[in-house]
Amino acid sequence: MRKIVAGKLHGIHVTEANLDYHGSITLDPDHCEEAGILPMEFVEIWNKNSGARISTYVILGERGSRCCILNGAAARTCQPGDQIIVCNSIYLDEAHITSLKPRIVTFDQDNNILDRLSYSVDLDPDGRYCFSILDEADEALAIPALVSGA
């Protein structure tokens, strides 16, 4: 079993940092559903502004709020306005890698969704892996893909 990316909120902006809360990251349920992120799921958080990398669990905020709130100790690593990547993962047998289609969501400055992408791993005629980033129409983008929220 290997740890594989399952979904990402890419370039979402921190709306609040609450040091006195119990811990976690509070996210809009609409955003979580788009990327396949579950409540209480452990996620990795990568801060594009500072380079900080942490792990915490997800709690759901108010639906439609576009919130991204770092709580407890995590609040020390991300400040309001920071652009972060929230990534969930699964453990998967390599034989099933071609059936996984991670969902990636990108955001504007106000945490409105810009792009809905997916990752795809396929086998070429020689049995080697090939990787694609697909847009909403399942069209492959150039790699590295320069999408509006990247």
From Swiss-Prot:
Q: Which residues bind substrate?
A: 56, 72-74
Entry-linked Gene3D superfamilies: 2.40.40.20
InterPro entries for this protein: Asp_de-COase-like_dom_sf, Asp_decarbox
Sorted alphabetically, which Pfam families does this protein's record hold? Asp_decarbox (PF02261)
Q: Which reaction does it catalyse?
A: L-aspartate + H(+) = beta-alanine + CO2
Record's keyword annotation contains S-adenosyl-L-methionine: no
The primary site where this protein sits is cytoplasm
Q: Which domain of life is it from?
A: Bacteria
Q: In which pathway does it act?
A: Cofactor biosynthesis; (R)-pantothenate biosynthesis; beta-alanine from L-aspartate: step 1/1
Spell out the subcellular localization from the entry. Cytoplasm
Enzyme superclass (EC) = lyase
Show the PANTHER family listed in the entry: ASPARTATE 1-DECARBOXYLASE (PTHR21012:SF0)
Q: What does the UniProt record say this protein does?
A: Catalyzes the pyruvoyl-dependent decarboxylation of aspartate to produce beta-alanine.
Assembly? Heterooctamer of four alpha and four beta subunits.
Q: Which family does it belong to?
A: Belongs to the PanD family.
The record's section on NCBIfam families has: panD
Name the UniProt record assigns to this protein: Aspartate 1-decarboxylase 2
Q: What gene name is given for the protein in this entry?
A: panD2
